[in-house]
C-alpha cells in the first residue's frame, strides 16, 4: 500500500485546523500540519485495560456482566473496551466519519489475543445516536455518554483527546435530546 493523504477539510468544510489522514502500511495516521502533531490508534495498547478494568470507575457503575451497553459517544472506543472487558456487549455509535475510519482501521490491525476478544463484543455503527435510538428494536441495560470535553481542567489533554476535540463537536443539546428520547 502506498502512502496516501486524505484532506479532512474536503470532507468536512467546517474544520479550521489543517488535519489530514495519512494512509501507511502500518495503518491510518492523523496529522495536524499546523502543530506538526501526529496520532495513530493502536488498540493493542488497550491491553492494560484487561489488567486494570476492575479498578476503573466504570467497573463500579456497571457491576454485572453479559449486559447490553450502548455507547453514544464512541470516539476511539476506550471506554467501550473497558466495558467489554468486564464481560459486556457494547454497541458503539460514532457519527464522525473520520473517527470511525480510524477506529475501524485500528480494529482490523489488532494482534493481541485478549484485546481481540474484547473487541469481538463491540459492534460499531456510523451515525447519529439519537436516530439509532429512535429506530432500533434492541433493549440496552445502560446508555453511556463520555463528556470528554471538560474544558475547565487546565491540564493539557492527551494527544488522543486533542485530536478528538479538533475533529468532533460536542453538542450538549444533542446529548440532552438522546436522554429525553430514552426517558
Where on the chain are the PLM-derived regions?
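S-adenosyl-L-methionine
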Residues: 1-69, 77, 85, 93-142
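Mobile active-site "lid"/loop adjacent to the S-adenosyl-L-methionine
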Residues: 147-178
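Class I S-adenosyl-L-methionine
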Residues: 2-5, 141, 156, 183
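Short, glycine/charged-enriched secondary-structure capping and boundary segments
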Residues: 84-86, 105-108, 139-140, 157-160
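Basic (Lys/Arg-enriched) interaction patch that binds polyanionic ligands
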Residues: 68-102
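Conserved proline-anchored active-site loop of SAM-dependent methyltransferases
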Residues: 69-82, 140-158
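A short, acidic, amphipathic alpha-helical segment used as a generic capping/interface helix at domain edges
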Residues: 128-132, 170-183
Amino acid at each position: 500500500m502506498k502512502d496516501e493523504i486524505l484532506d479532512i477539510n474536503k470532507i468536512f468544510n467546517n474544520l479550521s485546523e489543517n488535519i489530514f489522514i495519512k494512509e501507511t502500511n502500518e495503518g491510518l495516521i492523523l496529522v495536524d500540519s499546523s502543530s506538526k502533531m501526529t496520532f495513530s490508534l493502536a488498540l493493542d495498547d488497550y491491553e492494560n485495560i484487561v489488567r486494570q478494568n476492575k479498578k476503573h470507575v466504570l467497573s463500579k457503575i456497571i457491576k454485572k456482566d453479559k449486559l447490553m451497553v450502548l455507547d453514544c459517544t464512541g470516539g476511539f472506543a476506550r471506554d467501550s473496551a473497558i466495558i467489554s472487558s468486564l464481560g459486556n456487549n457494547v454497541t458503539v455509535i460514532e457519527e464522525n466519519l473520520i473517527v470511525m475510519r480510524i477506529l475501524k482501521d485500528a480494529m482490523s490491525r489488532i494482534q493481541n489475543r485478549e484485546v481481540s476478544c474484547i473487541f469481538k463484543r463491540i459492534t460499531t455503527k456510523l451515525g447519529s445516536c439519537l436516530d439509532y435510538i429512535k429506530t432500533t428494536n434492541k433493549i440496552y441495560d445502560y446508555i453511556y455518554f463520555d463528556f470528554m470535553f471538560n474544558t475547565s481542567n487546565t491540564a493539557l489533554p492527551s494527544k488522543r483527546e486533542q485530536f478528538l476535540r479538533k475533529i468532533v463537536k460536542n453538542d450538549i443539546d444533542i446529548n440532552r435530546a438522546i436522554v429525553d428520547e430514552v426517558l
